[in-house]
Amino acid sequence: MDKAGFLSFYKGIHRPSARLISLAPPERLAWKPGDVKVMTLGQLLKHLATCPAHLATAARDAFPPAAEFSRANDEAVQQSATPAEAGPVLESNYAAAVKAIEGLREEDFQGKQIAVPWGPPTVMYRALMDMAMHQNNHKMQLFMYLKILGLPVNTMTLYAGK
């Protein structure tokens, strides 16, 4: 996949993410599906909104060491956001990610090895794809939260943001 193809693919993840965030009921931020160790709705909104920032970090080859990344992530997932807060954060982080990726040379996108905190060094496009899929997984998680809460979401909401 080339850089333009990736950006098109990532836009397809972003658009429904923004729509799903906007549908989250602000009065249910403390809700989670059962007495299990998962994020609350508010924590998930915050986390989903910050996911694109990691794509910008990957594009800059600027991930911190694994222990520092893990510690920061553990702290970050404890934070919560309302839909009104998460929406603008998602948009800002998405714009920064797109700008950073657009600024890459195609050769670097395709072949530059970068350090990632979750495993051995990998090719830039693979790290970006991993982070895009991470966001996609949390988009699906939010979709399921909203479905369980009885909101009128469906396949078009999940994949087209409608």
Name every feature range the model reports, one short phrase each.
Residues 1-4:
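Short, low-complexity N-terminal intrinsically disordered segments enriched in polar/charged residues
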Residues 7-11, 15-18, 28-75, 115-162:
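Short, contiguous alpha-helical
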Residues 10, 14-17, 21, 90, ...:
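Hydrophobic alpha-helical core bundles mediating ligand binding, dimerization, or RNAP-core interactions
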Residues 23, 47-50, 92, 103:
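Residues within well-ordered alpha-helical secondary structure of globular protein domains
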Residues 23-31, 100-111, 148-153:
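Surface-exposed helix-capping loop/turn segments at secondary-structure junctions
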Residues 75-115, 122-137, 141:
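Acidic/histidine-rich alpha-helical segments that form the ligand environment
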